[in-house]
């Protein structure tokens, strides 16, 4: 999907740039070439198009792929040997909030063993707890994703990507 419209696709592009031993422009140019300058209509369409045979490979979220597999889709997950990112979803309590104690209780609730077990078993998410074992072995090495770098460089990366996908090159 278009990383200019999909946060997960943007993170995947930034992950490739960070983990692959090539210059940024080389990563972008090679990936655009491999895609044939075509992208799925949206993140949700990636697995549909792979399942239907429109594409042989798709980049998507682990949890989404696991849901498709459990629903019977004839696909499998392959993790990049270079590693992949796992950008945390956030939850925080705003200091001085009107209902600060309730907010703290909510955070305690969502990181509790019962909710984290539910997240693993029913939502296909990785737990934030060390004392909960995932249903299946979690595969793929997790790289140290530099979120600060990604935020700082996102606009430039997306501009280069859009130019490449339009056939105008990506700059240097």
What are these regions (language model features)?
Residues 1-5, 28-33, 39-40, 71-95, 109-132, 139:
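Periplasmic-binding protein-like
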Residues 1-54:
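Extracytoplasmic ligand-binding site segments that recognize negatively charged/polar headgroups
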Residues 17-18, 88-99, 118:
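A bilobed periplasmic-binding-protein/Venus flytrap-type ligand-binding module shared by bacterial periplasmic
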Residues 46-47, 64-65, 103:
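Short, hydrophobic alpha-helical packing/hinge segments within bilobed ligand-binding/sensory domains
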Residues 51, 55-74:
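A ligand-binding cleft/hinge motif common to bilobed small-molecule-binding domains
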Residues 106:
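Substrate/cofactor-recognition hotspot
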Residues 127-172:
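An extracytoplasmic/periplasmic, membrane-proximal ligand-sensing/linker region
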């Amino acid at each position: 999907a278009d990383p200019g419209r999909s946060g997960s696709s943007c993170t995947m592009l930034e992950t490739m740039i960070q983990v692959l031993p090539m210059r940024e422009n080389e990563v972008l140019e090679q990936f655009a070439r491999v895609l044939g300058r075509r992208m799925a209509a949206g993140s949700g369409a990636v697995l549909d198009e792979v399942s239907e045979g429109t594409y042989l490979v798709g980049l998507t979220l682990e949890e989404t792929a696991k849901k498709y597999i459990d629903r019977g889709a004839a696909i499998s997950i392959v993790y990049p040997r270079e590693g992949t990112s796992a950008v945390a979803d956030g939850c925080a309590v705003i200091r001085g909030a009107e209902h600060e104690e309730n907010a703290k209780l909510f955070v305690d609730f969502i990181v509790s063993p019962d909710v984290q077990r539910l997240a693993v078993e029913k939502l296909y998410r990785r737990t934030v707890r060390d004392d909960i074992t995932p249903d299946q072995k979690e595969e793929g090495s997790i790289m140290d994703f530099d979120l600060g770098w990604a935020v700082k460089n996102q606009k430039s990366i997306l501009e280069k990507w859009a130019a490449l996908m339009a056939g105008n090159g990506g700059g240097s």
